[in-house]
């Protein structure tokens, strides 16, 4: 069973619907891109488009500052790609021995990581692993638990067993024509996973780390962060039916539970309308018809 997100309630339906089997992947960028290379290429990302939906074009143009949460998010998506990819890009700092040594010699130390010895050990480890991101052993164990629970979920397991080909972290780009303004907006997408099923249909899977993967908890995140808009952007750029887009919600805290969610037609319709309106705003901004800010009119709340 797969949960389908609706407003204002959740329904649970059998995942055996008649859907379009044909799909075009003509927008795929053939060159393999790293995350940094993808961010550098031209095109409006789903993150920026969501920002336009929630606020304005000018808000979407402000670069997002890096943070611990974003770094952990990148590590999460890398380990979901593959353990080999994680080993390539990350090094795990196991501080068990240095912490034990510090506490044995100075039992009154409450925060060993603030000591000179700890910082020296950390610095040496970073020097030995230049070019890699560093994650703690605790974070690494959490990531492995999340990955294990994702791929042992019966829905995910069934999809992967039916797959005859997978596209992992591939980059796509599409020029979307805006009829009302005789203009085009370049949009890009980098889905976590696209699975080609044996029956010639596709599933697009998006890994979502969260604190609460229950229907009530995930629904809150879903609409707060406009995951629906992200989904329709990805599906439009790649050429996949949004009903074949699945969110795999993974708790990043114990008990690390996992649930799979899809979107109802009503949710897709609202998200598609918001996406189209955002593209119009972007087109107006790019053609200097609008400064990309908030409305100058009075808005009655």
Which sequence ranges carry the predicted segments?
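Generic detector of well-ordered secondary structure
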Residues: 78, 235-236, 277
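Short helix-capping/linker segments at secondary-structure and domain boundaries
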Residues: 82-88, 239-243, 285-287
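Charged/polar, low-hydrophobicity segments characteristic of intrinsically disordered regions
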Residues: 108-115, 264-277
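Metal-dependent nuclease catalytic cores that hydrolyze phosphodiester bonds in DNA/RNA
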Residues: 5-8, 12-189, 296-299
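Mg2+/Mn2+-dependent nuclease catalytic core
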Residues: 168-273
């Amino acid at each position: 069973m797969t949960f389908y997100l609706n407003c204002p309630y959740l329904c649970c339906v059998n995942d055996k619907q008649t859907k379009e089997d044909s799909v075009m992947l003509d927008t795929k960028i053939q060159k393999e891109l790293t995350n940094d290379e993808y961010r550098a290429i031209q095109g409006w990302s789903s993150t920026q488009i969501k920002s336009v939906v929630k606020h304005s074009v000018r808000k979407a143009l402000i670069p997002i500052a890096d943070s611990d949460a974003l770094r952990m998010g990148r590590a999460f998506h890398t380990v979901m790609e593959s353990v080999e990819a994680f080993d390539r890009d990350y090094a795990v700092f196991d501080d068990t021995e240095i912490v034990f040594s510090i506490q044995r010699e100075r039992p009154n130390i409450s925060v060993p990581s603030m000591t000179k010895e700890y910082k020296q050990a950390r610095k040496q480890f970073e020097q030995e692993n230049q070019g890699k991101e560093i994650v703690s052993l605790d974070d690494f164990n959490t990531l492995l638990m999340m990955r294990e629970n994702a791929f042992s979920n019966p829905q995910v397991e069934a999809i992967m067993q039916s797959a005859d080909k997978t596209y992992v972290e591939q980059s796509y780009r599409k020029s979307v024509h805006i009829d009302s303004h005789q203009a085009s907006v370049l949009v890009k997408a980098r889905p976590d996973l696209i699975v080609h099923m044996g029956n010639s249909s596709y599933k697009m899977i998006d890994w979502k780390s969260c604190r609460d993967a229950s229907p009530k908890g995930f629904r809150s995140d879903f609409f707060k962060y406009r995951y629906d808009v992200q989904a329709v952007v990805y599906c439009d750029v790649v050429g996949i039916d949004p009903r074949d887009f699945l969110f795999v919600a993974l708790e990043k805290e114990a008990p690390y539970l996992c649930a799979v969610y899809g979107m109802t037609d009503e949710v897709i319709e609202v998200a598609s309308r918001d996406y189209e309106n955002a593209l119009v705003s972007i087109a107006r901004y790019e053609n200097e018809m609008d400064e990309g800010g908030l409305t100058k009119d009075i808005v009655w709340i």
